[in-house]
């Protein structure tokens, strides 16, 4: 009996030590992170994207992958207004591509409410692969509009200047 108790205590201690070593990424929640639709998104997010495993975050309706994080997601943003930035459609979701901080991209859903934003370090993962991996979860957000003519065929998100803009 003592051996069973000691084994159980040792296993619990090992689990605690391993979980305390897991990184927690600090993120700020979006203004509408408490929207129940964001909960529908977060429970459907993948455990990994490419070779990047999901890591803990400390804010509602957020997610991160990789150590250090190469993909960050927040849900609950205000939907973006029409813009001249490139728009791509991947996995049934329209995205506005902000390349201002290349090689890091900010991708914002277009025509979904609430909106979600994804930040991708493209030196680690392809933005296209990230968006395809997230599409199933993001589709939980109701579609309220779409880009007028988004890039849909082989849309290499980075550096594709031929994409249409959001209306």
Task: Describe the predicted segments one by one.
Residues 21-25:
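Bacterial signal peptide processing site
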Residues 26-77:
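N-terminal secretory signal peptides
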Residues 77-84:
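Short, charged/polar surface micro-motifs in flexible loops or helix N-caps
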Residues 15, 43-50, 157, 161-162, ...:
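Intrinsically disordered, low-complexity prosegments and terminal tails associated
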Residues 84-167:
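Extracytosolic low-complexity repeat regions of secreted or lipid-anchored proteins
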Residues 1-9:
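Bacterial N-terminal signal peptides that target proteins for export
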Residues 16-20:
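C-terminal motif of bacterial Sec signal peptides marking the signal peptidase cleavage site
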């Amino acid at each position: 009996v003592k051996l069973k108790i000691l084994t159980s205590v040792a296993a619990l201690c090992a689990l605690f030590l391993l979980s305390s070593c897991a990184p927690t990424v600090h993120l700020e929640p979006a203004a509408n992170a408490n929207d129940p639709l964001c909960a529908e998104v977060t429970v459907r997010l993948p455990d990994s994207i490419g070779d990047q495993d999901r890591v803990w975050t400390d804010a509602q309706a957020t997610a991160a992958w990789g150590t250090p994080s190469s993909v960050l997601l927040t849900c609950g943003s205000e939907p973006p207004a029409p813009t001249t930035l490139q728009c791509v459609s991947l996995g049934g979701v329209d995205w506005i591509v902000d390349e201002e901080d290349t090689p890091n991209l900010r991708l914002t859903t277009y025509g979904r409410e609430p909106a979600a934003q994804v930040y991708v370090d493209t030196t680690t993962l392809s933005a296209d692969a990230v968006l395809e991996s997230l599409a199933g979860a993001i589709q939980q957000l109701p579609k309220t509009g779409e880009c007028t003519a988004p890039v849909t065929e082989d849309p290499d998100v980075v550096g594709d200047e031929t994409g249409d803009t959001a209306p």
